[in-house]
């Protein structure tokens, strides 16, 4: 079964990150009398740790190799392969009819999300949502579950027909100092107040990535994880930095970021609109 998260095509947002580093808590020692527990996560409206190719204006989200989940403050083994379905093994866990399940690779505790200020992506189309703060939750019954997600996402559909320099990073900042990424505790089906910053940078490594020559409705060029916030009264600044030192700046009206939803930002970049580095004399 394949599921799709429908893209809200809105021009956009801004997002921010948290400057705080936090270690993921270690796997909790299991008390005597526990048994091996296996929970299976299926494709669903919110299930994802990476984007698949878009079809008919929708993007499927899939499990990725290395993913793990939490149940009763205990971490599962990481999965070896991704896909629309994944089986998570807990070597020793208290048996129960239901389990509260969390997908969280970055937070300091199972039910605390941490969306970092510095996010990374190593290549075009190779998204890193889990390590960039993606946070999911579910109730497992009869050994199965389907994730819902408390974080939001932006799909960068950035392209150019004449910019040849590689893109090094994208930085989004929001006016008014609103916190749009950082650390937030999960309770009552949503993330609570977020403690973090009002900007976030998605970096593409030292060499950067080449921009595609045209917009693409099926391949996701880049994506970022965001804290869901009402940015409808904010102004968003988006800075694209290139390997030759040039910069492209956008300013847009903010939008409301909805948990579990993706906002697409289609941006044509023209060489004539770049701010070029100053040549010293």
Where do the model's predicted regions map?
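Single conserved hydrophobic/aromatic residue that forms the stacking wall/gate
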Residues: 273-281
